[in-house]
């Protein structure tokens, strides 16, 4: 499989020029548009469709900081994250996860919008700090530690989604 960075002819780096990424995405999608292959043979149409899918997958990877970091780790180690087998070994973070889940549950039960807003801000701040730490680990080529940050960020992303769901339920009342 081709590197998402190579597909867009971008340097392998955690910080990606999003404007340049969008520009190159549009150019690739335009060149692979089905209208360009109307008179082409079936095999050529199929190849264009596969390339278009590859471009879309690469875009998704490069737009998401966690997926982007995992791509960098995979390129440098030859190993991909096995999400089914992953669980963080950081006991302190596991305890923090339990506390956050309990806090969110209590906020939802109490229907306290101010507490939810405050909690969401704390999670957002934690996520931002962890992204900064992840970038530092990637720059220092500390692949195992960077992978652990990816795991933690995946949890925080899921927690942020759960916060949004609680927010929606609170505002429905």
Language-model segment annotations:
Residues 1-173:
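C-terminal accessory/regulatory regions appended to core domains
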């Amino acid at each position: 499989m081709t590197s998402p960075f190579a597909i867009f002819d971008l340097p392998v780096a955690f910080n990606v020029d999003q404007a340049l990424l969008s520009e190159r995405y549009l150019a690739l999608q335009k060149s692979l548009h089905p209208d360009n292959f109307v008179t082409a043979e079936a095999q050529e149409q199929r190849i264009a469709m596969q390339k278009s899918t590859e471009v879309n997958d690469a875009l998704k990877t490069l737009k998401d900081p966690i997926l982007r970091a995992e791509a960098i780790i995979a390129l440098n180690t030859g190993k991909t994250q096995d999400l089914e087998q992953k669980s963080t070994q950081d006991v302190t973070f596991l305890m923090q996860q339990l506390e956050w889940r309990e806090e969110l549950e209590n906020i939802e039960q109490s229907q306290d919008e101010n507490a939810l807003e405050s909690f969401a801000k704390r999670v957002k701040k934690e996520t931002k700090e962890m992204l900064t730490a992840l970038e530092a680990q990637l720059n220092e080529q500390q692949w195992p530690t960077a992978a652990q940050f990816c795991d933690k960020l995946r949890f925080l992303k899921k927690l942020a989604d759960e916060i949004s769901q609680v927010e929606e339920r609170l505002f429905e009342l």
